[in-house]
Structure formats: C-alpha cells, structure tokens
UniProtKB/Swiss-Prot annotation:
GO terms for molecular function: beta-glucosidase activity. The active site is at D287. It catalyses: Hydrolysis of terminal, non-reducing beta-D-glucosyl residues with release of beta-D-glucose. Glycans are attached at N25, N72, N259, N315, N322, N394, N434, N472, N543, N651. GO terms for biological process: cellulose catabolic process. Keywords: Carbohydrate metabolism, Cellulose degradation, Glycoprotein, Glycosidase, Hydrolase, Polysaccharide degradation, Secreted, Signal. One of its GO terms (cellular component) is extracellular region. This is Probable beta-glucosidase M. Pathway: Glycan metabolism; cellulose degradation. Belongs to the glycosyl hydrolase 3 family. Pfam families: Fn3-like (PF14310), Glyco_hydro_3 (PF00933), Glyco_hydro_3_C (PF01915). Residues 1-19 form the signal peptide. Its EC number is 3.2.1.21.
Length: 768
C-alpha cells in the first residue's frame, strides 16, 4: 500500500518557464531536458482492494514463466485474426493470449455487431445510468467475439481545442462531466467481462503533429503539451482519476509529448501521477506505434507495446543482465497484464481470443453473433437521448400530423453501400458529403448492422400516417412545394482521427439552409455533428423554426430522430460544449498549435490558459455564447425552487488524513461527502419529460463556476421531484502545488443550480 505522506518531492509540479534559446532554431531535444521531472523507480502493483485475488493468481502465474515468456507478454504480435492487436498464448500454462480491439463506440472491421452512439452523443445525454447500460450491452458484444480488451473509452482529448479532430470520441469538454460518464461506462463494459483500455493518457488535445514527421530529410518531433501541475490535476488528470477509480484494467498512453517527454515514456505522468498518486493497478499500453524508446520506456512505467515492438524483445532481458533495468520491473509488467486477465475472470469461460474477429471478413468464416435483441432498447434510447434541441420557435416541434413534409440535404440519406466499416476519409473535409453521419472517422469508427437514415425513417413514418413526403437530396438550391407543412434540412460536420478540423462551419451547408429557408416558412434543421458546429449564419433566420444538434447517434440515427420529431420521445439532451457566436470567441483555443519560429523542429503548445477552457473561458472573459454549455430545450417546461444547502461536519481546510493508504483513484478521503444540496423541480408544461438538473460551484480564487453535480430525472406533468446532490472533498477542493494535495479553500463558496451553465435560477452560498 502506498501512503500519501512523503510524496511532495516525488510529485513536484512542472514549471513552464524556459531558458531563452541561444540560437535561432532549436535542433536538439537536449534543450528541453528536465522540463518533465524524473520519477523513478516504477511502482509495483500492490494488488490492493478489489485486485487482491487477481494479483495473488497473477504472481503465482508469473513465477512459473521463463524470461522469454515474460517478455512476450509485453508486446503485440501478428495473429491470423482481425483483432487490432494480439498478445501471444502460453500453451503450457493454458494462457490463450489476448485480443484487443477498437473502439469505444462499438467493434469495427467485423460482422454481426452494432454501431453504438459515440462518446459525444453519450455526453449530450447527461445520463449516467444509460451510459452504464450502453457500456454493458456494448461490452457483451466484445465478449462474444472473443475480444479481451476494448480499446476505449476516451477522455483524452478533453476538448481543449475547438477544432480538435477526435473531440467526438470523448464525452464532454468538462472534466467532472466526462469523469462521471466514463466511470459508468467502464463499470458497464467490465461488468460484461471485457477489460477497458481507457485513452489517451494524457493532454492529447490535437491531431496535428501528434506524431513525429519527416519531410525532405527534416525531422519534426511530435507536439509537446506543456502543462503546469495545477492545470494537469484540475482538468486533464481529473477524468482519469475516475477511470482508475472505476477499475479500468488498462490505460493507453498517447502519441504526443508532455512537457517535452513522450507520453509513453514520461516517468512523471506514468510512474508519478498514474501509478503512485492514483494507485493504478492495471497496465499501461501504448497507442499504436507510440513507443519511442526502449528500456527508458519500461523504466518510465510502460508495460505493453502495440502492435509490436522492435525496441524491447530480447533487449529487456539484456537490460536486466547489464543492470539498466531491474528484473522486478519485468515481473511487474507481466504481473499487471496477467492480473488484469484474472480481474476480468477471463481465465474461465471466455471465448477463444479473436474467435469472432476474422482476418478477412469477406472470406468464409464462422459467424459469431455479437449483437443481441436484448440490446435494442438501450441502443435506441442511447441514440435518442444524445439529440439536443436548441431552437423551437412557436413550438414547431413536435410535428402536428403534417400532411406533407419535404426533405433536403446530403445528410438525409444512407450510404450507397455498407461494408464492415464506414469509409475512413484519408483527409478531413468539413462534411461527409456521401451519406448521413452516424460516427466520426478513424479507429473510433464502428461496423453497423444496418443504418437507419433519416430519409428512410421518415418515409416509414409517412407510410404509417398516410401522408406525403418529397425529397431532393442533391440540389443546393432546391424547389419547395408551397403546400409542404415542414421542410427538413439535413447537414453534417465531419471529423476524423489523424486530422484536426479545418473549421467549425461549412459555407455550402449554410447556403443550403438559407436557400431552403428563403422558400419555406417552417424550416427545421438537423445537424449530425462530430464536434462543435457554429450556426450564426442562419440561426436567427425567421423561417428557421427549429434546430437539433443530432451529434453521432450510431445505426439507429433515423429511428431516434423520428421519435423526437413526432413527439413520441421528448428531447432531453444538453450540450457537452459551448457553441460560440463567432469562431474568434474561442481565441487561442480555436486552432491546433503548429511548428513555428525557434520551435519549428519541436512544436510547443503551452497550456497557458490554465483551467480556463470552454465555458470557464467564456465566463471569465464575459463572452456571450450562442448556446452555452449544458443548454438544451424540451417540449415541456421545468420550474426550480427550494434550494437547500446542508454542510456535513468534516469541512476542515486542513489536509485530509495523510496516513490514508492510496486506493484505486487516490486518497479515499477525496470522496468523503462535504456538502449536500437539494432542489425541487416541477414539470409545469404539457407533457412528461426528463430534466438534467445541473449544479455549479464557485470555489474561492477559482473559475466563476464549475460543474460539480448533475442528475437526470423524469418528471410527469404537474409533478414535483426533489433532486439531491452529494459533493465530495475533491469536488470542493483545488490542487495545491506546494502541499501536493487537494485542499478546501477558506472563504465563501457560491452554489448555483439550474438548467444550464448560464440558466441558474437558484443560488446560495456556504462558508468554510
């Protein structure tokens, strides 16, 4: 067991002050040495708490391994299957090996599985219970297919850069929001007996220059995320703390550098923060091709390399022989990997690794059915709840028995063909022009069993109603029948791994919207968006009556949307990011950082804004957003009243018990309840609905407000429910870089409760 006392020197904060260069261009990484503190040795897993039995078995298993067998556990190998990566079997000890596969929104490159809603869509649902159910049902598909480890979910990137190409894979730009949803997701997936490799650790906030590049013989290193200790803890490490507390068996380290040390050999973040401070018991796996050093990476805390390693292999045993690596480090690497296998109970009753992942899906192979009829309800509900209604002029929606609807836009139709993975565009256009967008591009993509496109679902609805539907998918300036009751315009905003987005708008799509709106007095716009999408060019058009951010719903996209359009479901989604009125409002956090000036060969991205990203930055700078973080409309109305703030006895500003043994997630006293808050919410509208009650706290000397509670509740018409929030010590503390502790602050705290980060009808305070 690790104790908190004595960690101050080990976990000292990172300085962002650099010595002035003595030459125009920096040509050696030696210039940056020491900017990321060295933390050695790599802590051994303790097998504490829920891991005790798994570690006992793993240590006995590893004791019977040869050095070569231990080494083989630490790096991927080729196998005749379609898994993203494989660890070889050890037949003499009945270890069948491991299959690890993408990704956090459903399996890809295989058949008989579902394409689930993406991370951003789950974030927009604000539904913790649904997040766990989604994880459980999705995890069961991986289990049936013989996948030991799901490569996900994602909490890095957090979403610092508005144009970030992979923001859609994560849940939210807020660390608290993201942390609770990833916690429930991991609990769900691992309850299905499948491990998670949560990613990308850490501060992986842009795709541009994420990897080293070489052009015309000139080598450019990966971008460095330069981040101070306070910001690291209060933003980027926060959701990973919830990841560790949830018991994730693996964490995937990221491509880029952190304070000029590569993420997969950064001893500060791996040995210091993850394995010591947070008490992580699982193993650290590289992203694909993210290993940049040999023995240095193992000593820094890396445990497994994917998809293979040319730097380890026999070099590990050689390093032990020559004293550059301890034998105990290799034992710990192997133990962490095998303990995770035992922790998921995969030693008994688990399918053969990769049995449902054929190397060639188009060649004859055994059909392993991953999807289940039991998942249908959760699949659809997950798709429904991530839609966010942001405009509904004169209660345009839900539709009132229209006799005729007209459909326009490239995003309305399904793809012309459907294989075992949607097209991964080899560049990053503003839109996916060929079909409706249900998922982003890259390794986070998935393999739909079918795609319910909006046009298909609307046609089915029209058949059932006996009404009429017209459509023109391809025209940029279509004709509109004057007798149509509603014009439904479908556009999208694309994003993919490997590229950051070129912008937050698309002129062609905006022109389509305004062209239709100029001819139709009831224009309803649906945007399938893989990230922030600005709407300032047409949001105030008098004929644009309703707007839905539909995000990335997965294969039930059309079905989910029609449920909402026709009022069988009431919109309950809320934005997990801020939509600005102008791209310039995001300031320096709009674009990714590029190589420039003296850092042309070593790109530097200074996180100098600290904790002020997204709504925190808008609040600090007094910028009025188009739609604030947490905003979303309903077909009903909710009234808030009866704010009650009750402190519990232990609210000392002193350090929490320093002798407390570290458990998964850190000091267990961080979750001691310090404050209880309750409010009453009444449904004062015409229909039943779900409301997301949000609690924000203004901590002394901190941001104006930070999300510190949310609950989604169903409220019948005319009924009142009481919503309760329990706030822990971590929720009300700030990170002290000197004490290296989470500390409560002396002074007056503000408490806000309401419908969004800016619609907060209830306000109170308490003093510590």
């Amino acid at each position: 067991m690790h104790a908190i006392a004595g960690l101050t020197g080990l976990l000292a904060g990172v300085s962002l002050s650099y010595a002035a260069p003595t030459h125009e261009n920096i040509t050696s990484d030696a210039y940056f040495y020491g900017q990321s503190p060295a933390v050695y040795p790599s802590p051994e897993g303790t097998g504490s708490g829920a891991w005790a039995s798994a570690y006992e078995k793993a240590k006995a298993f590893v004791a019977n391994l040869t050095p070569e067998e231990k080494v083989n556990l630490t790096a991927g190998t080729d196998a005749d299957n379609g898994c993203s990566g494989n660890i070889p079997a050890i037949p003499r000890l009945n270890f069948p090996g491991l299959c690890v596969s993408d990704a956090g929104n459903g399996l890809r490159s295989t058949d008989h599985v579902n394409a689930w809603s993406s991370g951003i869509h789950t974030g927009a649902s604000w539904n913790k219970d649904l997040a766990q159910k989604r994880g459980l049902h999705m995890g069961s598909e991986y289990h049936k297919k013989g996948v030991n480890v799901l490569l996900g979910p994602v909490v890095g990137p957090l979403g610092r850069i508005a144009e970030g190409g992979r923001n859609w894979e994560g849940f939210s730009v807020d660390p608290y929001h993201s942390g609770l949803l990833v916690y429930e997701t991991i609990r769900g997936i691992q309850a299905a007996g499948v491990g998670t490799s949560t990613k990308h650790y850490i501060a992986n906030e842009q795709e541009t220059n994420r990897n080293p590049e070489s052009t015309d013989g000139i080598d450019v290193a990966a971008v460095s995320s330069n981040i101070d200790d306070k910001t690291m803890h209060e933003l980027y490490l926060w959701p990973f703390q919830d990841v560790v507390r949830a018991g994730s068996v693996s964490i995937m380290c990221s491509y880029q550098r952190i304070n000029n040390s590569y993420g997969c050999q950064n001893s500060k973040t791996l040995n210091g923060l993850l394995k010591t401070e947070l008490g992580f018991q699982g193993y650290v796996m590289t992203d694909w091709g993210a290993q940049h050093g040999g023995i240095a990476s193992s000593n820094a805390g890396l445990d497994m390399v994917m998809p293979s390693s040319t730097l380890w292999n026999s070099n590990l045993t050689d390093a032990i022989a020559n004293g550059t690596m301890e034998a105990s480090r290799l034992d710990d690497m192997a133990t962490r990997i095998i303990a995770s296998w035992y922790q998921m109970n995969q030693d008994a009753g688990f399918p053969s690794p990769g049995v449902g992942m054929p190397a060639d899906v188009y060649a004859p192979h055994q059909a392993i059915i991953g999807k289940s009829s039991d998942s249908r309800k959760v699949l659809l509900q997950s798709a429904i709840e991530g839609h966010v209604l942001v405009k509904n002029k004169n209660n345009t929606l839900p539709l009132k028995s229209p006799e005729m609807i007209s459909v326009f836009g490239y995003d309305a139709k399904g793809p012309d063909s459907l294989g075992f993975a949607l097209e991964w565009l080899s560049y990053s256009p503003a839109i996916q022009p060929n079909h409706t967008l249900i998922v982003g591009g890259g390794s986070g993509g998935n393999s739909p069993a079918y795609i319910s496109a909006p046009l298909d679902a609307l046609q089915q609805q029209v058949i059932e109603d006996g009404s009429s539907i017209l459509w023109n998918i391809s025209a940029q300036d279509p004709e509109v029948d004057p007798n149509t009751d509603a014009c439904l315009v479908f556009i999208n905003s694309y994003a993919t791994e490997g590229y950051d987005r070129a912008g937050l708008v698309d002129e062609g799509s905006d022109e389509l919207v305004t062209n239709v709106a100029s001819k139709c007095s009831n224009t309803i716009v649906t945007i399938h968006n893989a990230g922030i999408r600005l709407v300032n060019n047409w949001i105030d058009h008098e004929n644009v009556t309703a707007v839905i951010f539909a995000h990335l719903p997965g294969q039930d996209s059309g079905r989910a949307l029609v449920e909402l359009l026709y009022g069988r479901s009431n919109p309950s989604g809320k934005l997990p990011y801020t939509v600005a009125k102008s791209a310039d409002d995001y300031g320096a956090l709009l674009h990714p950082k590029l190589p420039e000036g003296q850092y042309g060969l070593f790109p530097q991205d200074d996180f100098s804004e600290g904790v002020y990203i997204d709504y925190r930055a808008f609040d600090k700078q007094g910028i009025e957003p188009q739609f604030e973080f947490g905003f979303g409309l309903s077909y009903t109305t909710f009234d808030y009243s009866g704010l009650n703030i009750g402190q519990v006895s232990d609210n000392s500003t002193s350090r929490y018990p320093p002798s407390a043994a570290i458990q998964e997630g850190g000091n267990p006293h961080l979750w001691d309840v310090i404050l209880r808050v309750s409010v009453d919410i009444t449904n004062s509208g015409p229909v039943a609905g779900d409301e997301v009650a949000q609690l924000y706290v203004g901590i002394p000397n901190g941001p104006v407000r930070q999300l510190r509670g949310f609950e989604k509740v169903n409220i019948p018409v005319g009924q009142t429910v009481t919503v309760e929030f329990a706030l822990g010590r971590r929720d009300l503390s700030t990170w002290d870089v000197v004490a290296q502790e989470w500390l409560l602050q002396s002074g007056t705290y503000q408490v806000y409760v309401g419908r969004s980060s800016r619609d907060l009808p209830l306000q109170g305070e308490f003093t510590i």
